[in-house]
Amino acid sequence: MELKKQILRDSYAVKITATEGDKVLGWGFLYVIYNDRHPEPYGLIENVYVEQEYRSQGLGTKILKDALQEAKDRGCYKVLMQSRHGKTEVHNFYQKIGFKDHGVNFRLDLIDSKPKQRD
């Protein structure tokens, strides 16, 4: 048996950043991913973050809806999101947007890496 690797150049990432002047208020990432299971790509939204002082003002909703529109524009047939256990407020926010709890994620850390921003 032989394993072959192929770099898929049609998969890519989009960073959505909310700013006010030079100040970054929040961001999110949309990854558009192609595979052989479906003819259309799927989207993966990760690391949606809003600075503490700008939360509860609709900014997270705007970032998320912009990412969802980008996924639609790119022809994604579904969008996935991930979140850690115990983040009830975040989970409620995602459900309010229309996401549903679906399955289980598994993770294996390959290196010890800490996020740049706080929760």
Predicted features and spans:
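Conserved acetyl-CoA-binding loop-helix of GNAT-fold acetyltransferases
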Residues: 50, 56-69, 96
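A conserved beta-turn-beta hairpin within the catalytic core of GNAT-like acetyltransferases
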Residues: 35-45, 101-102
